């Protein structure tokens, strides 16, 4: 079977699972947590989502394109990976600092849930899916995602039992993102030459900033469109309507 067919198969299975699992969790969470608590979750997640955007910028698209273009040259690909990821670390750390400032200075309620949503930004800090997308290794990313998704569903069913467990639900979802991305680092030495990190310098990082930002602008518009409704409902209406 060709690589293209295998990748298509992995993606198809993942999409089916991605569609099926919410059919299990959504009715359960609606009954156990209720609309108000789910509204709190949606609102705080939407706020954290803006900081995830700041952390990632256009790295997923730009990183995938760059790696795909030079994947036949392992030396160049390895160097590019560490340069792009170094930039990603900087933007993610900046985003985390700003989010902490938001929690301290602006956030007046649901602080614990908001803090736990912050793990989504940590997840963005260690998100190197774009490396594996670039080398067309969908088996690693899809298999890992499926295992994590099934695990989170099991944990939700076992641990989330009442509206007071909103923080547990939030922790499961956000920590799942961190764990899912952290697992990928085990496979990095199998894809790139780790010694290439020694060749990374400021000039090498700077050359990736402009093309990254170019791809970020349309992504920003699309992403804000998808999460703005939850933010506006949470800010101007009730959490119950947001949920």
Where are the regions that the model predicts?
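Interhelical loop/hinge segments that connect adjacent transmembrane helices in multipass membrane
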Residues: 1-4, 139, 166-170, 182-227, ...
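Signature of the first transmembrane helix
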Residues: 3-60, 153, 213-234
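Membrane-water interface segments that mark the loop-to-transmembrane alpha-helix transition
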Residues: 6-18, 44, 49, 53-103, ...
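Residue-level recognition of transmembrane alpha-helices
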Residues: 11, 15, 42-45, 84, ...
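Helix-loop interface residues and adjacent transmembrane-helix termini in multi-pass membrane transporters
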Residues: 32-35, 107, 134-135, 162-163, ...
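Membrane-interface junctions at transmembrane-helix termini in multi-pass inner-membrane proteins
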Residues: 71, 121-145
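Hydrophobic alpha-helical transmembrane segments
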Residues: 111, 118, 143-190
């Amino acid at each position: 079977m060709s690589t293209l067919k295998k990748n298509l198969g992995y993606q198809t299975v993942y999409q089916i699972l991605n569609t099926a699992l919410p059919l299990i969790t959504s009715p359960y969470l609606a009954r156990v947590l209720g609309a108000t608590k789910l509204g709190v979750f949606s609102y705080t997640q939407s706020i954290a989502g803006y900081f995830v955007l700041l952390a990632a910028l256009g790295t997923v698209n730009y990183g995938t394109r760059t790696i795909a273009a030079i994947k036949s040259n392992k030396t160049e690909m390895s160097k590019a990976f560490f340069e792009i990821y170094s930039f990603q670390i900087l933007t993610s750390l900046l985003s985390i600092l700003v989010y902490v400032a938001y929690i301290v200075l602006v956030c007046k309620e649901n602080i614990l849930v908001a803090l736990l949503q912050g793990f989504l930004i940590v997840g963005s800090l260690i998100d190197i899916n774009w490396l594996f997308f670039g080398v067309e290794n969908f088996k690693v990313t899809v298999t890992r995602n499926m295992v994590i998704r099934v695990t989170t569903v099991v944990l939700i069913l076992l641990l989330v039992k009442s509206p007071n467990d909103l923080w547990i639900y939030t922790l499961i979802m956000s920590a799942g993102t961190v764990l899912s991305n952290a697992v990928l680092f085990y496979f990095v030495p199998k894809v790139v030459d780790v010694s290439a990190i020694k060749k990374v310098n400021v000039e090498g990082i700077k050359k990736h900033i402009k093309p990254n930002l170019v791809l970020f602008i349309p992504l920003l518009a699309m992403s804000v469109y998808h999460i703005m409704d939850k933010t506006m409902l949470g800010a101007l209406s009730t959490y119950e309507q947001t949920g």
